[in-house]
Swiss-Prot record:
One of its GO terms (biological process) is TOR signaling. PANTHER family: GAF/PUTATIVE CYTOSKELETAL PROTEIN, TIP41-LIKE PROTEIN. InterPro entries: Phosphatase_reg/MetRdx (IPR051330), TIP41-like (IPR007303). Belongs to the TIP41 family. This is TIP41-like protein. It comes from Caenorhabditis elegans. Pfam families: TIP41 (PF04176). One of its GO terms (cellular component) is cytosol. One of its GO terms (molecular function) is protein phosphatase activator activity.
């Protein structure tokens, strides 16, 4: 057996051992959280062979981005199942498919000298050697919906209910991707679920910070009740220039769980995601 094959087999075994799976049922809903190690930088099979199970090949084939984030957790996912056929899944591949692959980011800071000096080397590299792409990896991803109807709604999530200290029956948190923006900030996509008696709350949060320039948060919040055949999904984009955040403690802006509260809402959408009653059984 070649050394190469021995190494590959060790890596495969390590990947299997590193995988974590959590499941929880609440009424009509099932929650499945999967976690594993980051996407490999090279394939584990020989170049003259195709392996349908190779995740790196899948990402290379399906993503148009010139570069991927430094850390992509391709084996991580969070899924809400509605009965037999409906689901909302959060995964890195579908999220990255919504990153702009053909132009540089519009960070809405005009001719900011701070931004220009901090990123000039990266801009020049992209312009000269690569296709331009959104190196902040901003994604408006709301989840991958299967077997459900999505309709606009005037219903809103009861945020006061979520502030209650109800007993948590199940919780899970996964990272989908992360990049340090060439040491000039961070871009991060996280998914979390919290299940209480009678209801649940899911949060998908994209947090992006270009140091001393811009802060952006895209939140998808989903709330459902135990025996409802639908959930309410709220999506919000919040952002602000650092120059408008001088009144905020800088430590707050570095906290992915607190920064959003200091940012104004730029855009928001509200949906009802539902399945037919007969599909619940």
């Amino acid at each position: 057996m070649s050394d190469r094959r021995s190494i590959d087999e060790v890596m495969v075994r390590a990947a299997k051992n590193a995988k974590r799976e959590e499941k929880f049922d609440l009424g009509f809903f099932k929650f499945i959280s999967l976690a594993g190690h980051i996407l490999e930088s090279s394939c584990k099979h020989s170049e003259d062979q195709e392996d349908p199970s190779c995740l790196k090949c899948k990402y290379d084939r399906e993503l148009k981005l010139e570069e991927r984030p430094e850390m992509v957790f391709a084996r991580n996912s969070l899924t809400i199942q509605f009965g037999r056929l409906g689901s909302i899944e959060f995964n890195a591949l579908d999220a990255l498919k919504m990153v702009c692959a053909d132009r540089l980011p519009d960070v809405k800071v005009g001719a900011s000298t701070v931004w220009q000096s901090a990123r000039q080397d990266r801009i020049q590299q992209i312009s000269e050697h690569q296709k331009p792409f959104d190196w902040t990896y901003t994604t408006h991803y709301k989840g991958t919906v299967t077997g459900c109807q999505v309709t606009p709604t005037t219903e809103r999530i009861d945020m006061e209910r979520l502030k209650r200290r109800d007993e948590i029956l199940f919780s899970s948190s996964i990272t989908l991707f992360e990049d340090e923006l060439a040491d000039h900030g961070i871009a991060q996509l996280l998914a979390r679920v919290r299940v209480m008696r009678g209801y649940f709350f899911v949060l998908l949060r994209f947090y992006m910070r270009v140091d001393n320039v811009l802060l952006r948060v895209c939140d998808t919040r989903i709330v459902g009740n135990e025996f409802d055949g639908h959930v309410i999904r709220e999506w919000q984009l919040r952002e602000a220039k650092y120059g408008n955040l001088g009144h905020v403690d800088p430590e707050e802006l570095l906290d992915v769980d607190r920064a959003w509260m200091h940012l104004p809402v730029v855009e928001e959408h509200f949906d009802r995601v539902s399945v037919d009653r007969e599909r619940l059984f």
